[in-house]
Amino acid sequence: MSLVRRSNVFDPFSLDLWDPFDSVFRSVVPATSDNDTAAFANARIDWKETPESHVFKADLPGVKKEEVKVEVEEGNVLVISGQRSKEKEDKNDKWHRVERSSGQFMRRFRLPENAKVDQVKAGLENGVLTVTVPKAEVKKPEVKAIEISG
């Protein structure tokens, strides 16, 4: 059983409830407020360690590979950043609901000493970014048998 919390399903404040005043406030506050980008700006990234590597995965649906950057800075800090552009709006369009997020995101991860930062690989497939950072092999101590005389 995993102790890692994967979602906010049990958070009563994250539920999508009907609000009778929602339409009143939507007419005053435009649908493209800063809250619309909050979910994307705080992109969630999984980091798992295998015996051979550190693997980072991020769900980035609708993001093109040209809109994502993966870098290593300061020697051991992995930086994953990107941007999802807003959909072009027509002045005649009337939005009923805006749930897909847009905007920029940036996440930084300090890599452990065993990370081979010169061999980092990244791929974007089916909306999932996977960054693999190989680990340095742990050197086994050399044991030399000493012959006992006598």
Swiss-Prot record:
Q: According to its UniProt record, where is this protein mainly located?
A: cytoplasm
Induction (record text): By heat shock.
A single GO BP term for this record reads:
response to heat
| Region called Important for thermostability under elevated temperature, residue ranges | 1-42
Task: Specify the sHSP domain's residue ranges.
Answer: 36-150
- What's a GO cellular component annotated to this UniProt protein? cytoplasm
* InterPro entries in alphabetical order: A-crystallin/Hsp20_dom, HSP20-like_chaperone, Small_HSP
Q: Which SUPFAM superfamilies match?
A: HSP20-like chaperones (SSF49764)
Which UniProt keywords are listed?
Cytoplasm, Stress response
The places in or outside the cell where this protein is found are:
Cytoplasm
Q: What highest taxon heads this organism's lineage?
A: Eukaryota
Q: How does it assemble?
A: Forms oligomeric structures.
Name of the molecule in the record: 16.9 kDa class I heat shock protein 1
Supply the source organism for this entry: Oryza sativa subsp. japonica
